[in-house]
Every structure is written in C-alpha cells, then in structure tokens.
Amino acid sequence: MTQTAHPDTVLIVDFGSQVTQLIARRVRESGVYCEIVPFQSAEEGFHRLKPKAVILSGSPASTLDTGSPRAPSVIFDSGLPVFGICYGQQTMCAQLGGKVESGHHREFGRAFLEVEKDCPLFDGLWSLGSRHQVWMSHGDRVTALPEGFEVVATSSNAPFAFIADEKRKYYAVQFHPEVVHTPDGAKLIANFVHKIAGITGDWTMSAYRAKAVEAIRKQVGDKKVICALSGGVDSSVAALLIHEAVGDQLTCILVDHGLMRKDEAANVVAMFKEHYNLHLLHIDASDRFIGELEGVSDPETKRKIIGRLFIEVFEEEAKKLGGADFLAQGTLYPDVIESVSFTGGPSVTIKSHHNVGGLPERMNMQLVEPLRELFKDEVRVLGRELGLPESFIGRHPFPGPGLAIRCPGGITREKLEILREADAIYLDEIRKAGLYDAIWQAFAVLLPVQTVGVMGDGRTYEFVCALRAVTSVDGMTADFYHYDMEFLGRAATRIINEVRGINRVVYDVTSKPPGTIEWE
C-alpha cells in the first residue's frame, strides 16, 4: 500500500469495526504513521510494515463464535507493545489464556470509568481515583484475565474495562478511545504510541510533501502525466503535488459537463493558470452531456450517462495530446481501505475514481496516486502546504454528477440554469452570515413540482426549491443544520425575487439516516 517506507509505523489490525478509520486518524494526529490491515492479511502486513506497535480494533463479531477473527500469533510473539480496543481486548484475552463470556448487561453509549491503579497510559492525563467519561459499545465482556494482566480501571458494567500487562506492554480497553464521545481517548492513543511504544513521530504533511515529490519523480521519470481536474480538493492537491515534482510533464484536463456550480469551471481554470502556471485544458462538453441527459429522470441512469460520457470525452482529449504514460488519480486512503475490505480480504484492484473508471486499462496507462496514503483532513493540510487558497481547501463536497442529481426528475437546460442561480444565492447568503465553515455541505435542489403563487398582481405557477444543509464529521451520518428562521426567510426571499422560475422555497430537515445527504 505504501509508496515509501516508514521507519516508525503502527499496524492497526481491522476486525471489521465501523470506526477503525478513526483509530488511524488519532494515531496520525499524534504525528505517527499507521496502516490499517484486515485481520485475514495481518501476518503478511506485520512482516511487510515491520511496525513498532500494534493496535487491535473492535468488531461486530463475537470471540465466542466458531471461526471468529483472531490476531496472528506473530504479534504476541514479537515483544511489541499491543493495544486492544473492545473486540481487540476480548480476542487478546481469549488468545492469551483469559476468558470471555456473553454479557448479561449490554453496554452501549456513555459510561464512566473509575481509575483504580496508576498506569503509564494515564501519564499526564488521569490520576488514581479519578472518574472519566468513555463510550461503550459491547455485548460480550472479559470475565477472567490472562496471566500477567491486572485491572487499572472499571465501569459499572465492565469490571475489566481497562487492563494492562505492563511487563509485556500489553494494554486493552473495553471502551472506544477513538471516538469523540471519549473525551480523553485521543490522548490515551497518543500516550500509547509515544510513551509506551517510544515512537517520536515524524508524520507531518511537510515531510510527506517532500517524500511524495521524490516518489513521483522516481516513478514518472521523464514521461508525461495527465490528470482529470475537477476543482475539488483531492484532484487539485494531487495536480499541484505532481506539478511540483515534474512541472510541464503534467497536463490537466477539466471536462466541463455543464453540471457545475455557477462560474465554477471558469474560476478553477483562472486559479490554476494564473497562480500555478499549470498546463490546463478546459473542454466545454456541456452540449454533449446535457443533450444526452435531457428528459432522463432515473438517477442511476443519469449517473451512468455522465460516467460514460466523461470517459469518452477524457479519452478523446488525452489521445489528442499523445504520448502520456501516466494517469493521475486522487485516490485517498479510505478508498484503499475499502478495496481491501474486512469481508472480502485482500484485493489487488484498487477502487476506481468515479470519474476515470476504466481509463488506465483502456488507454494502457499507469496510475500515479500521490494521495493514496492520506485521509481527507490530511489532504486539506497538504493543500495549505502547497499554497492552495482556503476558498478551495474548505469547499463543501460536490458530487461527480453535479447538478444532475440535485434536479430530481427530467433534466432540461432551463431547469439547470434555474437551479444554478438559486444555489449561488443560497451559498452567498451562507457566506455573508459567516456560516459556511460551520456547515459540512449546503446546496439547493430544484424539485419536479410546480405550485401556485402570487407575484405582483399576477398568478404564477413555478418550481419549488428545497434548501439543504447538514453538519457531519465524515459524511457517514449527518444532521440537518439548525438555521434561525430569519436566515431562512432572507435566503428564500432573495431566491424567489431574483430567480425567475421559482415561487416557493422549503427547507429539508431530514437527518442521515434515514435520508441521504444528496436527494439522488
């Protein structure tokens, strides 16, 4: 998975927890590199990475079930520090001679730990006799400890909530230190990697930038690279990093499908040409895309048309350039993790970016993926390192199919223009109110519904516009943003007065789940 060797690495063995990525983010935040490896290939990962410490994740499985996941014995034979979390604690105990039973009292949500013994993991954090909030999510629990372990903290329903074998540097907890609901959890993980494992850590985006540039130069040599640039954070940072490495050997192609936000394509082109002197081709293919999309109402059909046309247009333009051996792609570490899944085991096929699909195979090109070790928040930090304007770094997520999936029902050029204007006004009001950075994602949706209205002395029969805004940490779950009514009234009034074709505005108060963030 790695592009370059990392001398100080933490191996995270994934047993299928939904929050394993949060463990990795906490380790990275402490300045230490880590990789997630599914338990099926953990032994191979251990030998490949040569880690300085190991963390065992949670899991929906039960150690009581036949064939449930286990950590490879090489981890416990290595003499390395090991930190088990939830299921990781249970399998550690089961494998080392302890006992795990199904709990009579399931424990989900907030719990409170009582510190019963001093422990190196508590250094500078918790003191003997203190009480601390943690987040539990378990049914099974440890009922007998392996030899050498002792209890260092308990909760009302988990007498072995925090255990340690300090001689072997084994630590294990029944709660989840990686989630925000355990306020001191990130510090506990930092103490494990720094004070227990003795890793000082040199994982910074400044250091990563230098290593990535070197790796790109080594991979590409004097060959040409093409990059599909959307103006989003991932493709923008990837393009700048590659440009820093190989300069004019990189050509970026921005395919304008006519489904972008107001002035978006022009702004992206202007920024990259004026500030970075980057070779960028702006291909206006809007007529081609919208021509095929007009009248199409099924959202999956829309996506397929857009994906197919993007590949066709990009391939045509790339062939005109000729001689490119490499295709740049903004693959992130979560994409890599998903492709090497808990359920499916290791896979040699990395998940393709939704826009460039099968292009590498079709065009006989090799991939350059300079961001494939990074999480989204790290990409943003790297973007700042590279001098990308904050207006680009902090942009809300925007779907690949663009406005096509914010226009439910059949698409027409007229409806797209109405939506584009309404969306621009809405985002303008959000920025004026100083709310943009507090919101994960905000956008307008043009509904396939017309209602009666009165404007001046006349009757109108025009479209309904829905406004959407959500708060989220990772997009997996989301809550609608709680605007005050004065803001909503102001935004609605502007849209109705300034956008011909809309006479009613509503606000979407659906959370995820049960709804999704996008409407299609």
UniProtKB/Swiss-Prot annotation:
The active site is at C86, H176, E178. Keywords: ATP-binding, Glutamine amidotransferase, GMP biosynthesis, Ligase, Nucleotide-binding, Purine biosynthesis. It is an enzyme of class 6 (ligase). Its EC number is 6.3.5.2. Pfam families: GATase (PF00117), GMP_synt_C (PF00958), NAD_synthase (PF02540). ATP binds at S230, G231, G232, V233, D234, S235, S236. InterPro entries: Class_I_gatase-like, GATASE, GMP_synth_C, GMP_synth_GATase, GMP_synthase, GMPS_ATP_PPase_dom, NAD/GMP_synthase, Rossmann-like_a/b/a_fold. GO terms for cellular component: cytosol. Residues 203-395 form the GMPS ATP-PPase domain. GO terms for molecular function: ATP binding; GMP synthase activity. Pathway: Purine metabolism; GMP biosynthesis; GMP from XMP (L-Gln route): step 1/1. It catalyses: XMP + L-glutamine + ATP + H2O = GMP + L-glutamate + AMP + diphosphate + 2 H(+). PANTHER family: GMP SYNTHASE [GLUTAMINE-HYDROLYZING], GMP SYNTHASE-RELATED. Catalyzes the synthesis of GMP from XMP. Homodimer. This is GMP synthase [glutamine-hydrolyzing]. It comes from Rhizobium meliloti (strain 1021) (Ensifer meliloti).
